[in-house]
Design a protein with these regions (language model features):
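Structured mid-to-C-terminal alpha-helical surface segments
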Residues: 1-165
Length: 165
């Protein structure tokens, strides 16, 4: 994984930032990404019309689930992983299990079937400090009331709704 930073005085394709605060954008490029992913062509219209190749939503869901299960931040959690997990399930996006398995093998030297993955996920969901999860994501949520339903049980029930591709 290679990292670089764009600062507020960096010109990239004539992009500049007009803000009072200093803006930094971290860009990471995975030079050896896990394989068995799926892509699709998408048309974007701004700043001008162009076609781009991107990961499919099921493949992105696999990356998010890998992060949710394996991300190690000592005692901290990343609330955005939980928010995104809810988003994928809410939008009925199937999970690309083949890519998830490839990620676990490459980064964690683990092989598992769907049942074992769901067990690992449920353990993570049950053990998390949900107040810490909420506190981490709160600054990014427009309506804090959305988080009132969040509980360990809520996420365990979401896990039962995962569809596999």
């Amino acid at each position: 994984m290679e990292s670089a930073f764009l600062k507020d005085n960096t010109d990239v394709y004539d992009i500049t930032f007009q803000t009072e605060k200093s803006v930094k954008i971290k860009i990471e490029v995975d030079t050896q990404p896990p394989l068995k992913f799926k892509t699709e062509q998408k048309l974007l219209l701004l700043p001008q019309s162009f076609m781009t190749r991107c990961f499919t939503l099921p493949t992105l869901f696999a990356g998010k689930m890998h992060a949710l299960v394996y991300r190690a931040w000592k005692n901290r959690v990343k609330g955005r992983d939980w928010y995104d997990f809810e988003w994928y399930v809410r939008h009925n996006i199937p999970l690309d299990f083949t890519h998830l398995s490839e990620r676990a093998l490459q980064f964690n030297q683990e092989e598992f079937d769907k049942e074992t993955f769901l067990q690992k996920l449920n353990e993570r969901l049950a053990a998390a400090d949900i107040n810490q999860v909420k506190a981490d994501v709160l600054p990014f949520v427009r309506n804090p009331k959305e988080l009132d339903i969040w509980s360990n049980d809520y996420f365990l029930q979401l896990a039962k709704m995962i569809r596999f591709e």
